[in-house]
């Protein structure tokens, strides 16, 4: 499955125009600064500038630490929110999934009405969304029963929250594309599992898994093979009525399906259902 997605934008651009003003206000008014702070009294604005410079230079670890300090010292301000999102974004770039998710979840809990809420949900979805693997990266090399799809489901829920809460967000169109991709990939995974069972002679399990895929994911490309698997499995089980019913649905909905009249290749034998 090949799908092109937009690259992740820099954090919460809608906050950017407000952040510098907040930083200046903190500098003039004094945002919760401890005189014994390891930053030696550096202004919030200066710290933020340094953090951005470090991030631009690729020194993500140093930038993350600075954003952590800003988050604490500017607590309750838009600058603190921006620092959280910048921090989460850099952790995401460094593939530190657990830490990145923790920061985003903290942001959403502390700032449920933030103007950058849509970006937070979008980033949360991206963290769980593994585009490179695409659910099929090393599928043939791995026992299907060992693969966990929870991260994919979590990503879907984050994107759904974004689309439902912020339908006009600039991130919504890409989130919708990713949601569709996830649904198709999850359905294909379920069919892969059904095929896995079938090829190992677990025909009842194969039929049940294929049927579940059809119930959970309607109108997906993998539905064709799911119907074929049901018919093939019922044929192996000697359940002619159920086999014929699955065959009828397949032919009715996909009259030109390549699965009609074919079977799976097996080292021991070839077989054809129709």
Name every feature range the model reports, one short phrase each.
Residues 2-7, 27-274:
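Acidic, polar-rich low-complexity tracts and alpha-helical solenoid repeat scaffolds
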Residues 10-12:
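Intrinsically disordered, low-complexity terminal tails
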Residues 16-27:
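Bacterial N-terminal signal peptides
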